[in-house]
Curated annotation (Swiss-Prot):
Source organism per UniProt: Geobacillus sp. (strain WCH70)
UniProt xrefs under Pfam families: PGK
EC number: 2.7.2.3
Annotated Gene Ontology cellular component terms: cytosol
EC class (word): transferase
Residues that bind substrate: 21-23, 36, 59-62, 118, 151
Gene field: pgk
Protein name in the entry: Phosphoglycerate kinase
ATP-binding is among the record's keywords: yes
Phosphoserine modification, residue list: 183
Biological process, per Gene Ontology: gluconeogenesis; glycolytic process
Disulfide-linked positions: none
Amino acid sequence: MNKKTVRDVDVKGKRVFCRVDFNVPMENGAITDDTRIRAALPTIRYLMEQGAKVILASHLGRPKGKVVEELRLNAVARRLSELLGKHVTKTDEAYGDAVKEAISKMNEGDVLLLENVRFYPGEEKNDPELAKAFAELADIYVNDAFGAAHRAHASTEGIAHYLPAVAGFLMEKEIEVLGKALSNPDRPFTAIIGGAKVKDKIGVIENLLNKVDNLIIGGGLAYTFVKALGHEIGKSLLEEDKIELAKSFMEKAKEKGVNFYMPVDVVVADRFANDANTKVVSIDAIPSDWEALDIGPKTRELYRDVIMKSKLVVWNGPMGVFEMDAFAEGTKAVAQALADAVDTYSVIGGGDSAAAVEKFGLAEKMDHISTGGGASLEFMEGKQLPGVVALNDK
């Protein structure tokens, strides 16, 4: 990575504004999954050990520029204290005199968590005044929030113009793993693209068709491709306006010598419910009033074989409606194949795929689970991420 990291700056005795991604799922004021907090620990611990005064900033949810009591970061501060085994001071604002006062009382190795940065309208507008107010709190800026790197916000991009700006360890790892996958992949290189809609994955498919040896399609978006081949898809998800695009993708794959894999059989249901009547049918035999909600057993075997023969697999998007157990087998089969393929480096592209490997208890068996759904998607589209671009070059 050609960006400076925390290793390249002397942080001893310095105030370090570290943007992290603590946007964790909450229910009734309690954190239901602390993966994102844990992911930032190596950088936080390093800064503490090096004698920095660590000032952490994050967003939580979508308060839209105003204070929402349920989205305060108090529960996050408590959980972080437990994980670090050290008290974390939490402020009620993210900048201003009270915050400066709290920072002035910090010793080397202390940790302070600012209030939710999205309580301020200037954050998402990337307001230079807010960015300057954040910068006034510190001597050095560290961005370890890969999950927010595709956003040009005051705490992810704006502040980097006013302070020395470097990457944290998580940011560094994400860019290195995803960067290598796109620029110098081990082969055979397979991409598995699922999820509900073609329109969300157009950029990824376009970019990856130039790089992969195998492209596997699943999830709701597959049925637009099935329709493009001239098959009837019953009541399955269809994006009518994307049929021609689907055709062009398949033609491009052929031109480039990319093996394009689509479902050969599917699990269909008579309604969208976990207790619906279901059956397995061949891809060209979907009944007119049924809908396909998962890939079938033959497809699972086919996809497993491709995965097992690959050296690198990037997976983004589930194979079916995995939230319902009746339609989770396809997604589970892909996750299991990745877990079993010991010679295959697996990169899970955040979002639903990450949630799926967690759900099936296979997260530990994956080589890299990206912490950023949207960010990893944009990275795989070949886009520059504003939060990364803003950091100092080596």
